[in-house]
Amino acid sequence: MTSVPIFESVSRFLPPANEDEQYWWKITGQHMARMMHEAGYPEDRQVECLLFHRFKVIPCLGPRPRSDTPWYKSRVGGGAADGCPINYSWRFGTADRKPHIRNFIEPLGALTNTPADPLNEVATKALLQDYSMTLPNVDLEAFWTFAPHYRPRIIEKADIEKLAGASLLVGAEMSPDSHTIDIKAYMYPRVPSQTSQLLTTILPQAMRDAYGENVCLDSLNFVHEFMTKDPQGSQLVLTGTTGIDCCKLQDTRVKIYVITRNTSFDHIAAIMTLGGRRPISEELLGQLKALWYELKGAPAELPSSEQLPVQTKPDGSKNPIVVPFYFDIQPRLALPDVKAYIDVSTSPVSDLAAANAVVRHLEQHGSGQNPKAYLNVLKDITPVEELETQKGVLAFYSVAVKKNELDITSYFNPQVYKRYFAHEVHLNGQRRSVFE
């Protein structure tokens, strides 16, 4: 991990911090600086976002690691993650748009992992409230209205212990040509019965409470009908995860996350097109199929009606493949937007091979500005030999269709715990160079 000059300049004039915050700043602050530098952010925007990260994100990451085992295993980053409470995303740009950088955190506080806060929601709500007072564009009206509908009514002690875990996450998007930080909140129902009631009871009532009794629910109702009556849509399973934009109510989107275990490309295409109701050109479907097969390590000649080959873990057990999607619900739209997620953490393809495949796709189709800058970021976070031989940096690639091209985002992990010993050597070396 090599330092970026602007990170050094900002660090030089920061006030003293405690040991935990110093650690997280030296690791994740440098990651953020590298991403913005490679993405071509203006220098003033880099400084602005680094200061936001230092004072509004770092204090929420909790105690610094003391071993390669997390004291609290966060759900940020999905199955690829090592329990670290932060991960990143890089939304590849287009010919006329620079990449967009985001981070996702599960805020950790004094009550995290204690009986006083079994759902780890206190620190998150405090952080969101702080954002609403310091970021002019943040509006929590929709979130405060939705959140009570997702909070479980748990009474029995045994249920509390069984269902304890993360219930909220926060995302922060830092666009290069803006002076705002866009905030998103993600809610996770802990009780299974809540998930089954999401489309029929919880979301309709939450949307009426937020937007008024006469709110148009066409888009939400379409998702429910698609998942109950369509031959392809009925194979989808709700995860319960729901994302919501923390902005003015009229601009707020609600994202509903689902999964499928059908891995045939014909099925993937049917979900992306909503059973043909949202057409996608054959050219774009062909691009998506080629990328899907390459990232999943499937042979190019595999028929589109066939399931992906089942992967076998080192211990001989089978590695089930699931495909996540989200539906983007907006009251003013009759149909939802759709985004697919390609999980590369369980793919036989190495992290470096997956990243190279995406960069190749972007270069072949003239998408993105200097997509190889993304490779520079990955190689700075993790040595090339680890990217070639190990898994864990890359979590997902998401793919949507925007303006007749594939809109691709990479989600990846800092590996703070997995690379704990390497970070210790790096930081101790830094400390010696400062005090010698």
From Swiss-Prot:
Record-linked InterPro entries: Aro_prenylTrfase (IPR033964), Aro_prenylTrfase_DMATS (IPR017795)
Summary of the function given for this chain in its UniProt record: Prenyltransferase; part of the gene cluster that mediates the biosynthesis of neosartoricin B, a prenylated anthracenone that probably exhibits T-cell antiproliferative activity, suggestive of a physiological role as an immunosuppressive agent. The non-reducing polyketide synthase nscA probably synthesizes and cyclizes the decaketide backbone. The hydrolase nscB then mediates the product release through hydrolysis followed by spontaneous decarboxylation. The prenyltransferase nscD catalyzes the addition of the dimethylallyl group to the aromatic C5.
Family: Belongs to the tryptophan dimethylallyltransferase family.
Record GO biological process: alkaloid metabolic process
Coiled-coil zones: none
Biological pathway: Secondary metabolite biosynthesis
Top-level EC class: transferase
Keyword Transferase in annotation: yes
Key words of the record: Transferase
GO molecular function (one): prenyltransferase activity
EC number annotated for this UniProt entry: 2.5.1.-
Pfam family for this entry, one: Trp_DMAT
Protein's name in the database: Prenyltransferase nscD
